[in-house]
Amino acid sequence: MNQSKPTVNPPLWLLAELTYRCPLQCPYCSNPLDFARQDKELTTEQWIEVFRQARAMGSVQLGFSGGEPLTRKDLPELIRAARDLGFYTNLITSGIGLTESKLDAFSEAGLDHIQISFQASDEVLNAALAGNKKAFQQKLTMAKAVKARDYPMVLNFVLHRHNIDQLDKIIELCIELEADDVELATCQFYGWAFLNREGLLPTREQIARAEQVVADYRQKMAASGNLTNLLFVTPDYYEERPKGCMGGWGSIFLSVTPEGTALPCHSARQLPVAFPSVLEQSLESIWYDSFGFNRYRGYDWMPEPCRSCDEKEKDFGGCRCQAFMLTGSADNADPVCSKSPHHHKILEARREAACSDIKVSQLQFRNRTRSQLIYQTRDL
């Protein structure tokens, strides 16, 4: 009998990464660098079975993500199946490929919520970052169409050194589009963002200015009765304590990749840990019994100084993927923490950001050709 079941809660949030296909080339994409090697995708029926198992375990929220989930022709069918099972459903999209007829189909299928991402507040920078000259106008048109259909609408802007100084214009755009919520999420350095970190990490001064801009707008909007919610997420590279990543490893979040690998966070597949496939094991068995999902649960795995730290119940030892990327071992204390013996790695990144002169055009953009080239080079 599995003794861990009574103490491990079910995954409340399921993220379905339906595909790695995407019409954009954002240099901060969280998809794996080797996505070009991974062409397989779960079928409609296989995804619906994943939803059924997750719902039976107690999952309540389902996000459709990618890549770009709109590239899946069966998306309305998947939305309907999820809604019939009782999920609250959220479409996380770039808006590229979205049409008014698709919005109507999604509404009829029962979609609850839509999040549209922008790269910048102006067409020129948006095009440079997305690798698509028509993207900005398409996003504007679809954001207005989403709002016209009374969807709760979130606009998402990934902030970095090349767009963070236009934060006031970004917020003004969100107000104009009547967003319900605005995610001003400073770049999290995983996947392609980690590859481009030196050219993306804002300086400490940029972060401080951005925090003040957000504070000023919150005050101004509250005074005018504007109910748009501004969520500003700072990079933990400028913190002294790590984030409680995903609310704790294998605690509330479960992600399934396009080909069916189950993960406790978006980036965990890069770790030297075996994660099972939903095609080979049930979700229940994966969540409660698999080595991968139990590897960093609780506190027994922790090294010092985490093991004896009085803050471990807040941050759960920090991010395992970040520890792996920066130190070579996921077992190490997250270098973000000032108590970590590897904190100098974060200090080095801050110094690099302070003197970086990398232009947008010099970033490595997320596309199939670049993905193939990276791994051809690494395999030599």
UniProtKB/Swiss-Prot annotation:
Gene3D superfamilies: Aldolase class I
Pfam families: Radical_SAM, SPASM
Catalytic function, reaction form: [PQQ precursor protein] + S-adenosyl-L-methionine = E-Y cross-linked-[PQQ precursor protein] + 5'-deoxyadenosine + L-methionine + H(+)
Note describing how the cofactor binds: Binds 1 [4Fe-4S] cluster. The cluster is coordinated with 3 cysteines and an exchangeable S-adenosyl-L-methionine.
Family statement: Belongs to the radical SAM superfamily. PqqE family.
Protein name: PqqA peptide cyclase
Gene label: pqqE
HAMAP family: PqqE
